[in-house]
A protein has these predicted regions:
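Lectin-type carbohydrate-recognition ectodomains
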Residues: 1-207, 264-276, 281-333
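Membrane-inserting effector segments that mediate pore formation, membrane fusion
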Residues: 211-262
């Protein structure tokens, strides 16, 4: 049977397992970064004869943690972006420590969904020390256990399977400071003639191919590892008494990143006086914006639990809107 010790600071509401494998000595530690949306990026371990003397981990938010001590033969593994743990063995050592016969951490082995594997093994391991925790979603949010001059026991905080991830409560704190596009693009230029005794109404129309983009940047690797929906309003330009300004549209569900090229068509009615020629010109604006956003990332887990953590990033978007219509009277229409 495995030699494991539960850690009550690691909630099984959010993680598949709170057991640390090894022995009962050392001082407890807890280095779990779910509240930052951070995931394990690199692990390095050192061994000394029959035990693992040190383990150091680096997280995607830039933080790191060393337990035990560096020294002796070592091995390390760096995760690629989006790479998940598929199998994990955290193995206790054989009971070789002093009179108390205490065990410590003896080996770590993992395999990923990219068919890569890594491990480090102390001497004289026994099969009864193997412990294969449920890896859940495959996302590791940190480590926990106990250590002193070596690593007594170790556990990996493996996130429960995720059913849905939603970026919600999105706010754009600097939106009122963003500049509205001021350079128009001409999309229609046409002359109309009226040789009758009555006003005539014509339609000025114009089209332009525009690439509409929306993207909420995600700065934590957890967010980049899973598929994320966004429930938010979109920054857009509206007419106000003093001109044009940015506002936020009504809530809708979006992909975290979209880019669609579409043909925008605008039509404007123009009235031409009797026996006159007029020139109609119309413009459009492409409103490009890069602005900071703040939001909550909501993880809806398959066990029915929900976890939220705060995120921030940059929203990048481009919208197209109708501009101005200019009407010039070209003088009398002579019929030529």
């Amino acid at each position: 049977m495995p030699f494991v010790f539960p850690d009550t600071t690691v909630s099984k509401d959010y993680f598949t397992d709170n057991n640390a494998s090894g022995g009962e000595g050392g001082s407890p530690f807890d280095f779990v970064k779910l509240d930052k949306g951070a995931v394990l990026k690199k692990i390095k371990a050192w061994k000394d004869n029959w035990l693992i003397s040190g383990v150091e981990v680096w997280m995607s938010d830039g933080s790191n943690k060393l337990v035990g001590k560096r020294g002796g033969p070592s091995g390390e593994f760096t995760f690629r972006d989006g790479e998940l743990i598929k199998k994990l063995n955290v193995q206790a050592s054989a009971p070789y420590s002093s009179v108390l016969k205490r065990r410590r951490l003896g080996a770590i082995w993992l395999e990923t969904d990219k068919e890569r594997s890594w491990g480090i093994y102390a001497h004289s391991l026994t099969e009864d020390g193997s412990y294969w925790p449920d890896v859940g979603s495959g996302i590791c949010c940190g480590i926990f256990g106990s250590a002193g001059d070596a690593v007594d026991r170790l556990g990996f905080a493996m996130l429960q399977p995720i059913s849905r991830a939603v970026l919600t409560d999105v706010k754009y704190p600097n939106l009122d400071m963003e500049i509205v596009a001021s350079t128009p693009t001409t999309v229609a230029h046409q002359v109309f003639s009226n040789g009758t005794d009555l006003d005539q109404t014509f339609e000025l129309s114009g089209s332009r191919s525009v690439t509409i983009t929306r993207e909420w940047s995600l700065t934590t690797s957890l967010s980049m590892t899973i598929s994320v929906e966004v429930t938010a309003g979109i920054p857009e330009v509206v007419s106000a008494k003093t001109g044009f300004s940015w506002t936020v549209s009504s809530l809708a569900t979006h992909s975290v990143s979209t880019s669609n090229t579409e043909t925008k068509t605008w039509r404007w009615p123009l009235v031409c006086p009797p026996h006159s020629r007029i020139l109609g010109e119309a413009t459009m604006y492409a409103d490009d914006i890069d602005t900071e956003y703040e939001a909550d990332m909501e993880l809806q887990l398959k066990n029915g639990k929900t976890y939220r953590y705060h995120v921030n990033g940059v929203y990048n978007g481009l919208n197209a809107r109708s501009g101005n219509v200019k009407l010039d009277n070209l003088g009398p229409y002579t019929g030529n």
